[in-house]
């Protein structure tokens, strides 16, 4: 396992674009006998993924908001420490919905795995998982927690530096009016000024932006603007 962590650290340091990084992660997973890999970054209920899991599973995961149900994500948030997991071994402790989730994942060769979560900036977290079709992960020795966190920390930095395109992410949208108003907000206008420029009432701007803030689950226009820019919605 230490050899795997060394390989991950080396991969994060290789020069190249995001395609080289994604191909390298896929090759690493295959070389060590895993079904695939998944990197998740979670910030204020917004989740993005870089993964080679099956396309249908990726779609189902995000369309059904499985990140809110996923026992692996829940455990990662609570302990921030490398761990192995198994849907079958944990079955007796799971809810009916969680058992159904694992059963669905097993259809795509995801039955067990190793996950390394780390804290990242501004209250966010990232986690890297290698998934297996085996009923459980058989570790020959305990994983070095410090080495694991260091390897994933370097991977997170590399993905952030490359501004890697997510394989999949939470659905997000702005309607045309919301996008227009928010573009003006992004360049420093007040809501009153936006209303004047667009020839609408102040309340129309306020209500539209309030609706968008509620949808994105944020409490300020500044946060909404930052999310919209980050997700290239404006």
UniProtKB/Swiss-Prot annotation:
| GO molecular function terms noted in the UniProt entry | DNA-binding transcription activator activity; sequence-specific DNA binding; transcription cis-regulatory region binding
Q: Which Pfam families match?
A: Autoind_bind
* Keywords (A to Z) from UniProt: Activator, Conjugation, DNA-binding, Plasmid, Quorum sensing, Transcription, Transcription regulation
Q: Which residues bind DNA?
A: 191-210
Which GO terms of type biological process are on file? Answer: quorum sensing
Question: Record's superkingdom?
Answer: Bacteria
Question: Where does the HTH luxR-type domain lie?
Answer: 167-232
Query: Which GO cellular component terms are attached?
Result: protein-DNA complex
Q: Which InterPro entries match?
A: Sig_transdc_resp-reg_C-effctor, TF_LuxR_autoind-bd_dom, TF_LuxR_autoind-bd_dom_sf, Tscrpt_reg_LuxR_C, WH-like_DNA-bd_sf
State the similarity comment: Belongs to the autoinducer-regulated transcriptional regulatory protein family.
The entry's function note states: Positive regulation of conjugal transfer of Ti plasmids. TraR activates target genes in the presence of AAI and also activates traR and traI themselves.
Protein known as: Transcriptional activator protein TraR
Q: What does UniProt list as this organism's lineage?
A: Bacteria, Pseudomonadati, Pseudomonadota, Alphaproteobacteria, Hyphomicrobiales
Gene that encodes the chain:
traR
């Amino acid at each position: 396992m230490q050899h795997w962590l060394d390989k991950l650290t080396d991969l994060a340091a290789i020069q190249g674009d995001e395609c080289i990084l994604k191909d390298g992660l896929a090759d690493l997973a295959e070389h060590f006998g895993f079904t695939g890999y998944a990197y998740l970054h979670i910030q204020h209920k917004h989740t993005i993924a870089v993964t080679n899991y099956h396309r249908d599973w990726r779609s189902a995961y995000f369309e059904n908001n499985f990140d809110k149900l996923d026992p692996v994500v829940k455990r990662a948030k609570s302990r921030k420490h490398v761990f192995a997991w198994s849907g079958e071994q944990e079955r007796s402790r799971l809810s009916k919905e969680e058992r159904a989730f694992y059963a669905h994942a097993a259809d795509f060769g995801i039955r067990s795995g190793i996950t390394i979560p780390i804290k990242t900036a501004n209250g966010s977290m990232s986690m890297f998982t290698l998934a297996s079709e085996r009923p459980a992960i058989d570790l020959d020795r305990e994983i070095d927690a410090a080495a694991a966190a260091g390897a994933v920390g370097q991977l997170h930095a590399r993905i952030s530096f490359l501004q890697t395109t997510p394989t999949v992410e939470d659905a997000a949208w702005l309607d045309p009016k919301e996008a227009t108003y928010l573009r003006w907000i992004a360049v420093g206008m007040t809501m009153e000024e936006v209303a004047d420029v667009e020839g609408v009432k102040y309340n129309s701007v306020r209500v539209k932006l309030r609706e968008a803030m509620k949808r994105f689950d944020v409490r300020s226009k500044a946060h909404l603007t930052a999310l919209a820019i980050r997700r290239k919605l404006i």
